[in-house]
Amino acid sequence: MEQTLSIIKPDSVSKAHIGEILSIFEQSGLRIAAMKMMHLSQTEAEGFYFVHRERPFFQELVDFMVSGPVVVLVLEGANAVSRNRELMGATNPAEAASGTIRAKFGESIGVNAVHGSDTLENAAVEIAYFFSKIEVVNASKPLV
């Protein structure tokens, strides 16, 4: 089973969309293997988005991500990375397919409801950034 990282961004948290977004993930067959609510510091946001540090939108992205609490999740399931990206929709909510998270809850390219890992390799790095191994459960393991 694959795992991927998802972040419910400050705009979705402040508008009380957490439950709806979690339901979308679970109804699609993805399981929640870890979850925490936190308010990112400037340093944490800069570290997480370090790969974008040379891009013109970097500071605006960091400022947005520290503007309020976020919910950080590890999602687990078959093809978790690609499934999560399909559920999220295009980065620009105006271009996102109807019914996707960003089409429903996003406002703009910068204020677009959720983040999701783009590759399995990046998912592993991003998960390790926010969670220790002991915090991530095997969500696909059947209960005894």
UniProtKB/Swiss-Prot annotation:
UniProt GO cellular component terms: cytoplasm
Catalytic-site annotation from UniProt: 115 (pros-phosphohistidine intermediate)
Gene3D superfamilies, sorted: Nucleoside diphosphate kinase-like domain
Disulphide bridges: none
Reactions listed under catalytic activity: a 2'-deoxyribonucleoside 5'-diphosphate + ATP = a 2'-deoxyribonucleoside 5'-triphosphate + ADP; a ribonucleoside 5'-diphosphate + ATP = a ribonucleoside 5'-triphosphate + ADP
Cofactor: Mg(2+)
Coiled-coil portions: none
GO MF annotation terms: ATP binding; metal ion binding; nucleoside diphosphate kinase activity
Enzyme Commission numbers on file: 2.7.4.6
Compartments, record wording: Cytoplasm
Top-level EC class as recorded in UniProt: transferase
Keywords: ATP-binding, Cytoplasm, Kinase, Magnesium, Metal-binding, Nucleotide metabolism, Nucleotide-binding, Phosphoprotein, Transferase
Pfam families, sorted: NDK
Amino-acid positions noted as binding ATP in the UniProt annotation, renumbered to this chain: 9, 57, 85, 91, 102, 112
Top-level taxonomic group: Bacteria
Matching PROSITE patterns: NDPK_LIKE (PS51374)
Main location: cytoplasm
Entry similarity comment: Belongs to the NDK family.
Functional description taken from the UniProt entry: Major role in the synthesis of nucleoside triphosphates other than ATP. The ATP gamma phosphate is transferred to the NDP beta phosphate via a ping-pong mechanism, using a phosphorylated active-site intermediate.
Subunit structure: Homotetramer.
Protein name, as recorded: Nucleoside diphosphate kinase
Gene transcribed to yield this protein: ndk
